[in-house]
């Protein structure tokens, strides 16, 4: 009876939560409608004031109009009611609605033949079918896209104001009928055939199938892509200027003279003449995850980083990738048959579109078999395990939410599985969960202040806490495993190992000081030998009785401590470490890294100007030079400071590293010798750019200034020419002109300024710069990048962009983990693009290799570096 009442209570609470979410959406609609009315009233008044002297296309809100509006607060509600009484027109979305959707891929979409990536070729964004407008040919030499700091991009803003459009008062005849207007794909052109939203699907546990998830993902993807374009852009053909509004702030973008007569912001654009395919992922998530490295019968090591599961064949030097997840993967479990894999993810940026869930998939075909827990998991899947005694018919998962709920699933029943049991696991953090290999009904969990022994019978879970008796109780039980007899072995934060007798909850044996610090991993081999890994950097072998065999591996400090230890090929061990490395080795032969990665937030990226190499640097103080052909690290160097930006000299012999302290280093790109260091202010060096002729270096700082240096002595000597002052906020991006005379720069308050580099003076007559040819296009706010901005963008969504050297492509990275590929220049609204997932954090930098054969992207907090092959498409495909 109590259980039924609790179940009914949970259902009622769930219904109330749904209503609250819906009401929040309605409130957002009302706020947006109100802002829309204010903006449109301002536009109408501005248009009437200048109608006798200017065309209506140039009408913008005036300061006086804004002042008058502030005195009309009493009329706001009436205006809002009038606006909402009309027939619904095209809805205006807010920035949070255009965030990434829940990309639940179908089983077929994840198929990968051979060793190729499972990266899915995305559907191109819809666009009108008009002829493509003529665009000029642009030559460029640099492709590094400096990025702003994390603080700027972590602050999220919701754009409530709709665009200021000129036109009759009838333009006000628009409203939102309900919250569904925000999420349905009707704006794409199917107003009379709405499709369920991801959030609606997630709220209906029994609605639909994998096919429905696929259809939904496709519709949502097309919707998001169709929204591309600066919705508030207005074109004045008389002056040849496009006015773009970001968070209500106008930005004038001047159209090149050759395009003024034929340019239209809404003209149709071609698909990019190439597509991307994920080739290689550098990195591994071991710093804060456990039990996430395994050897498969295919000879591949499986692990994850960001939103990608990597299947890496070390011997053949090939990677495959499972790309079904939409945000950070936090847990991984391998089925007893060694072919099926379950992975769990965290909640995404938009909780409705990227809800935490578990995916069960085939490691051979990369087909998704089941999607579990979409409406049941609150925060993220902290740990996972398949049952062993019954051949893996059950799956247990622990939620990372405050209650740390544990749920047991019959995962193969239906496409969404069947939840058999759920209970609160612990008030404290849970670090691991596992089934007994001999007792189907026994589950063990461990974590902060506890080890718990669970048994389930007749639909009930019974819990017994581990009893330490007179032994020291550890603060954390950090790892668990089972002997072949079913006894539990646990490791704790005190460095002790304990054996718990099968069926009991008391300690039968204890080994003190097995490690100097926490025991992170316990692995029992087929012959009964036990291998442990600890924070002390040691891997120790024990016999069945927990007596040392004398075999010890000391993992070098540079690789970190062993986070997980498992069996590899033959007698080899595979080790995942706390410094995001994957190692292979034996007790006889030393450990060697098969994968290394950054350990902290990553911002600096610069491709080599002449080789298939690129350099990355991050807040972990480490610089890596990577080889894209061998997929290896050429060299690494600890610079001793948090790195923010980097740039290769034109000849590739020198690399400049900018730090968060305002210091930047001059380093030999081959020997790693430090030639000199310089200090420009005390704020982070956001951007570093060499001029095309190699004679100047521009340094963009968070102190709002751009410092210009004369370069001499083969790029080893730097003499400051001056400082460009004029930005009201920190510098985010820089570009040199092709003739090395001018600079263009963006700032944190959405400015686009131009500079005479030799004089360090601002060029106030910006219209004079409309025909300047730019060597690169890393500035995100320019005429050539007008089309990269989604509707409702708040100016911080797009972090980075880079123009290809010779292939007419433009790549961008945004706050939602998406990499997008456009045709260059992307100077029209609703510019068509191809969108790719994989990163789970904001994409901080993108850059093409010197021959445009590959695109390199870096994630911020996900610390991942991804390498994409750029493959040309047929002309007919790019024109469709």
Kindly label every feature range from the protein language model.
Residues 1-7, 40-245:
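Intrinsically disordered, low-complexity acidic/Ser/Pro-rich regulatory regions in eukaryotic proteins
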């Amino acid at each position: 009876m109590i259980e039924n009442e609790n179940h009914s209570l949970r259902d009622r609470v769930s219904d109330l939560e749904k209503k609250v979410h819906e009401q929040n959406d309605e409130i957002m609609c009302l706020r947006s409608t109100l802002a829309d009315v204010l903006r449109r009233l301002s536009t109408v008044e501005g248009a009437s004031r200048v109608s006798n002297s200017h065309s209506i296309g140039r009408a913008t809100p005036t300061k006086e109009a804004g002042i008058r509006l502030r005195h009309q607060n009493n009329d706001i509600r009436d205006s809002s009611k009038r606006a909402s009484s009309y027939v619904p027109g095209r809805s205006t979305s807010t920035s949070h609605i255009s965030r990434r959707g829940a990309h639940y891929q179908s089983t077929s979409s994840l198929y990968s033949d051979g060793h190729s990536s499972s990266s899915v070729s995305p559907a191109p964004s819809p666009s009108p079918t008009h002829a493509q407008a003529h665009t000029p040919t642009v030559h460029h030499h640099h492709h590094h896209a400096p990025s702003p700091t994390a603080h700027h991009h972590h602050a999220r803003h919701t754009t409530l104001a709709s665009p200021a459009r000129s036109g009759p008062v009838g333009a006000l005849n628009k409203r939102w009928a309900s919250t569904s207007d925000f999420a349905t794909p009707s704006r794409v052109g199917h107003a009379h055939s709405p499709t369920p939203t991801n959030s609606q699907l997630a709220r209906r546990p029994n609605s639909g199938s994998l096919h429905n998830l696929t259809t939904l993902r496709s519709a949502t993807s097309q919707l998001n892509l169709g929204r591309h374009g600066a919705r508030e852009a207005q074109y004045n053909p008389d002056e040849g200027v496009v006015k773009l509004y970001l968070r209500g702030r106008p930005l004038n973008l001047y159209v090149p003279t050759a395009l003024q007569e034929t340019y239209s912001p809404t003209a149709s654009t071609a698909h990019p003449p190439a597509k991307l395919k994920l080739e290689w992922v550098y990195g591994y998530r071991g710093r804060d995850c456990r039990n996430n490295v395994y050897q498969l019968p295919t000879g591949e090591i499986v692990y994850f980083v960001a939103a990608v599961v990597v299947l890496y064949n070390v011997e053949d030097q090939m990677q495959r990738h499972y790309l079904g997840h939409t945000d950070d993967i936090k847990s991984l479990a391998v089925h007893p048959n060694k072919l099926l894999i379950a992975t769990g993810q965290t909640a995404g940026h938009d909780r409705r579109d990227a809800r935490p869930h578990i995916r069960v998939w085939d490691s051979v075909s990369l087909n998704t078999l089941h999607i579990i827990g979409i409406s049941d998991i609150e925060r993220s899947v902290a740990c996972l395990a398949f049952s062993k005694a019954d051949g893996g018919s059950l799956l247990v998962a622990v939620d990372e939410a405050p209650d740390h709920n544990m749920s047991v699933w019959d995962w193969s029943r239906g496409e969404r599985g069947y939840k058999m049991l759920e209970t609160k696991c612990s008030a404290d953090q849970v670090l691991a969960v596992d089934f007994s290999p001999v007792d189907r009904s026994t589950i063990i969990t461990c974590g902060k202040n506890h080890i718990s022994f669970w048994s389930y019978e007749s639909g009930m879970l019974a819990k017994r806490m581990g009893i330490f008796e007179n032994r020291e109780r550890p603060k954390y039980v950090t790892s668990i495993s089972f002997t072949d007899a079913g006894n539990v072995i646990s490791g704790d934060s005190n460095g002790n190992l304990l054996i718990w007798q099968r069926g009991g909850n008391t300690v039968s044996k204890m080994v003190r000081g097995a490690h100097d610090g926490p025991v992170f991993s316990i692995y029992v081999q087929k012959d009964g030998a036990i291998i442990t890994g600890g924070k002390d950097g040691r891997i120790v072998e024990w016999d069945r009785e927990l007596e040392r065999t004398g075999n010890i591996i000391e993992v070098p400090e540079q690789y970190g401590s062993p986070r997980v230890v498992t069996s590899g090929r033959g007698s080899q061990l595979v080790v995942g470490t706390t410094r995001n490395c994957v190692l292979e080795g034996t007790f006889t032969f030393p450990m060697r890294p098969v994968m290394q990665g950054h350990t902290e937030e990553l911002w600096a990226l610069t491709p080599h100007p002449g080789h298939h190499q690129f350099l990355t640097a991050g807040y972990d103080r480490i610089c890596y030079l990577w080889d894209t052909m061998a997929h290896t690290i050429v060299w690494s160097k600890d610079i001793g400071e948090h790195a923010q930006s980097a740039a290769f000299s034109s000849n590739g012999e020198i690399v400049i590293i900018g730090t968060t302290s305002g210091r930047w280093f001059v380093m030999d790109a081959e020997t790693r010798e430090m030639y000199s260091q310089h200090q420009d202010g005390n704020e982070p060096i956001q951007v570093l750019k060499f001029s095309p002729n190699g004679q100047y270096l521009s340094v963009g700082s968070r102190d709002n200034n751009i410092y210009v240096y004369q370069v001499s002595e083969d790029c080893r000597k730097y003499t400051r020419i001056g400082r460009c002052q004029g930005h009201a906020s920190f510098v985010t991006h820089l570009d040199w002109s092709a003739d090395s005379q001018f600079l263009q720069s963006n700032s944190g308050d959405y400015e686009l300024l131009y500079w005479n580099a030799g004089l360090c003076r601002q060029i106030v007559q910006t219209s004079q710069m409309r025909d300047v040819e730019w060597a690169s296009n890393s500035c995100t706010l320019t005429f050539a990048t007008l089309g990269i901005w989604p509707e409702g963008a708040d100016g911080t969504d797009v972090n980075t962009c880079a123009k290809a050297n010779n292939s007419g492509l433009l790549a961008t990275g945004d706050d939602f983990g998406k990499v997008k590929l456009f045709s260059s220049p992307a100077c029209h609204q609703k510019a068509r693009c191809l969108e790719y997932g994989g990163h789970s954090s904001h994409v901080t930098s993108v850059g093409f290799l010197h021959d445009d054969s590959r695109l390199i992207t870096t994630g911020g907090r996900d610390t991942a570096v991804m390498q994409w092959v750029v493959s040309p498409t047929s002309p007919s495909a790019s024109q469709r």
